[in-house]
């Protein structure tokens, strides 16, 4: 689906996600429910950062073919993931749950970029709406179509920051965001996890908090209420504020 047709559906987060891994997933070490969730979040963050770093290129009206193909973004995302994991490249060939989920995720990354080549390469158009938040949402939707019975990745945020109705937190997420991730004593960057139902099914749920960086403030900073480039009012956020959750 063309991003140009969906500019008004920009999600709030250039920096966030909520992740659910359904049972049964019990394993040891780096194949635990928790580690699978963290790895999926890390891969999504890695791919999203590639799109973020290429915003100037994507929105350059003077360039047609940007060379930013699905294969290029996928490869760069894997490189960033590997660096974030201390040099451990993802295993995308095994049949265990983690490998299957990561493989489906990198395939979704490739597919979304390929589906939006016309938008990315459209000449004589500056802002195209193919921003990290929209990219992440489309990747999550593609991933869910293929792996929704086993895992789900979602980008959400505190309710007052939600711009896209699809990203609204459910009741469990709202409670965890308000009572844990937003609590004064919560260690910044600490991940929240718990066994809790999702849509009537048992699941292991992991919330990875993300905080506004300087680059987020162009759309989510001050002055509060001023319209950003997407046409949404800014939230008045500051660097370090909780901006969302994977």
Which ranges hold each PLM region?
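General helical secondary-structure elements
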Residues: 2-4, 22, 44, 174
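Bacterial N-terminal signal peptides that target proteins for export
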Residues: 2-12
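Bacterial N-terminal signal peptides
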Residues: 11-21
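Sec/Tat signal peptide C-region and signal peptidase I cleavage site
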Residues: 21-27
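The canonical Cys-X-X-Cys-His
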Residues: 212-224
């Amino acid at each position: 689906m063309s991003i140009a047709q969906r500019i008004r559906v920009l999600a709030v987060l250039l920096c966030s996600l909520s992740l659910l891994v359904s049972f049964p997933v019990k394993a040891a070490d780096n194949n635990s429910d928790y580690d699978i969730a963290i790895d999926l979040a890390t891969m999504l963050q890695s791919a999203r950062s590639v799109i973020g770093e290429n915003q100037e290129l994507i929105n350059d009206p003077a360039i047609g073919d940007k060379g930013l193909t699905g294969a290029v973004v996928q490869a760069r995302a894997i490189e960033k993931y590997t660096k974030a994991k201390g040099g451990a490249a993802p295993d995308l060939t095994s049949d265990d749950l983690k490998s299957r989920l990561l493989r489906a995720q990198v395939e979704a990354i490739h597919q979304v970029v390929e589906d939006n080549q016309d938008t990315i390469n459209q000449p004589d158009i500056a802002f195209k709406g193919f921003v990290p938040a929209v990219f992440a949402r489309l990747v999550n939707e593609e991933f869910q179509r293929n792996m929704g019975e086993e895992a789900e990745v979602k980008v959400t945020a505190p309710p007052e920051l939600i711009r896209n109705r699809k990203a609204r937190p459910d009741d469990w997420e709202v409670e965890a965001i308000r009572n844990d991730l937003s609590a004064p004593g919560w260690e910044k960057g600490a991940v929240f996890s718990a066994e809790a139902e999702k849509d009537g099914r048992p699941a292991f749920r992991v919330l990875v908090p993300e905080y506004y960086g300087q680059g987020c403030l162009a759309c989510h900073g001050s002055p509060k209420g001023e319209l950003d480039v997407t046409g949404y009012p800014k939230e008045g956020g500051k660097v370090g504020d909780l901006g969302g959750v994977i």
